[in-house]
């Protein structure tokens, strides 16, 4: 049976995992960094191969956000190594990040990553873990749909901005249809604060106020928007 999924805001379960880069202690080995853990159904499968190539091509973007990548599947380390070699030889892409080898599904069980009807098969899950080891975001994709790496980067950047500013980001940030690249100010908690904020911020009403985000954060976030079809579909 699949394990209980760690909830947003909870600590990532402590465990030692085995990867093709050697053992890793989670979350301690990544303390001070953001971590994206993502599971895939199996090595040597077409959709998973496209995902790993996509993650590898954006690896430097993740590094700029102080973020490490960590893959996971129920394959063993030998399979991971051979798959990476195949990707390098056939597609000329180096996979620079480690992959957890979890042939018994023990790690996937702890993280709730097993497909409920697929036996020991990992789903396409994404966990974003902050520098303190807390789970901050969780994404799940069906087996027949590959992940969008641009959106994972945008989500990661938005989490970092909201932590820094104590604000929230609107839909489609940093290009929202209503407030553009601004961030949302949390609602007032007193009548006096509600009156004051109408003079302090740009507001549609006292409960809907917004302000500019730092320009450098906005520009970086825009790089992680889904790239136009003209660029992606060349």
From Swiss-Prot:
Residues 6-161 form the Thioredoxin domain. It holds the Pfam family 1-cysPrx_C. The active site is at residue 48. Disulfide bonds join 203-209. Gene3D superfamilies: Antioxidant, Horf6, Chain A, domain2, Glutaredoxin. The keyword Transferase does not apply. One of its GO terms (molecular function) is thioredoxin peroxidase activity. Transmembrane segments: none annotated. Keywords: Antioxidant, Cytoplasm, Disulfide bond, Oxidoreductase, Peroxidase, Redox-active center. The keyword Disulfide bond applies. CDD domains: PRX_1cys. GO terms for cellular component: cytosol. It catalyses: a hydroperoxide + [thioredoxin]-dithiol = an alcohol + [thioredoxin]-disulfide + H2O. Its main location: cytoplasm. PROSITE patterns: THIOREDOXIN_2. Substrate binds at residue 124. It is found in: Cytoplasm. The active site is a conserved redox-active cysteine residue, the peroxidatic cysteine (C(P)), which makes the nucleophilic attack on the peroxide substrate. The peroxide oxidizes the C(P)-SH to cysteine sulfenic acid (C(P)-SOH), which then reacts with another cysteine residue, the resolving cysteine (C(R)), to form a disulfide bridge. The disulfide is subsequently reduced by an appropriate electron donor to complete the catalytic cycle. Thiol-specific peroxidase that catalyzes the reduction of hydrogen peroxide and organic hydroperoxides to water and alcohols, respectively. Plays a role in cell protection against oxidative stress by detoxifying peroxides. This is Peroxiredoxin. It comes from Ignicoccus hospitalis (strain KIN4/I / DSM 18386 / JCM 14125).
